[in-house]
Amino acid sequence: MNLRAAGPGWLFCPADRPERFAKAAAAADVVILDLEDGVAEAQKPAARNALRDTPLDPERTVVRINAGGTADQARDLEALAGTAYTTVMLPKAESAAQVIELAPRDVIALVETARGAVCAAEIAAADPTVGMMWGAEDLIATLGGSSSRRADGAYRDVARHVRSTILLAASAFGRLALDAVHLDILDVEGLQEEARDAAAVGFDVTVCIHPSQIPVVRKAYRPSHEKLAWARRVLAASRSERGAFAFEGQMVDSPVLTHAETMLRRAGEATSE
């Protein structure tokens, strides 16, 4: 599954609401069918049945199973065996061993605890891992805190630290980096600012909890027309240059060209000839 090419707008959808599956798939780049926190305990059997009975495109679908070591996870995996889905999201990931147990499935490790944050590099290095995500609210709860954000909406320092840790671990091992959800659905401006920052520092995805957030995220990740035009020009100029060179008043070297290639990739344009 080439999730890197899917796009930046991923959407959680409760797995016990199969009537929402098609709408979610139409709105999002990737749908995350949720068997964990989004489903009440009494509804989990129905959610597992819905996975089998209401299939989506497995190339654009991830299933969030329950945490490792739980009876619910074992039941989730049994249900998944009857589907075409090959990628799972592991919540509260805390070790490489938890990820390796899920092979041969591809795994997006969701880090939501202090132990998971400390072991992020180990988790990212595990062979089944294809992506790394972090979760702010569960993280703060496990730390004994009460709020992940300050009054102005900005993340508190510990949340920012874990966010950066996950991004670095994902990048170090060539995994997708997924930014946490923005819980305030009505705060479009806050989501836009957060998604722009995520794209600027190297996240591949901002995960959403409502279809209305998807276009905001896509717009935030897409470079402006001016930046795309610059990227095309500088890459064209680089073909006749060796090493670093001056271009439009700026010194250009390999990292600058990588930034330009990333812009075009996010816009869906090829960068090789």
UniProtKB/Swiss-Prot annotation:
Which BP terms in the Gene Ontology apply to this protein? Answer: oxaloacetate metabolic process
What broad class of enzyme is this?
lyase
Residue positions binding substrate: R64, E112
> Keyword Lipoprotein on this protein?
no
Relay the cofactor remark from the entry. Binds 1 Mg(2+) ion per subunit.
GO MF terms listed in the record are: lyase activity; magnesium ion binding
Kindly list the cofactors needed. Answer: Mg(2+)
EC number(s) on file: 4.1.-.-
Q: Which of this chain's residues are annotated to bind Mg(2+)?
A: E112, D138
Keyword tags: Lyase, Magnesium, Metal-binding
Q: Which family does it belong to?
A: Belongs to the HpcH/HpaI aldolase family. Citrate lyase beta subunit-like subfamily.
- Annotated function: May play a role in fatty acid biosynthesis.
Quaternary structure annotation from Swiss-Prot or TrEMBL? Homotrimer.
Protein name in UniProt: Citrate lyase subunit beta-like protein
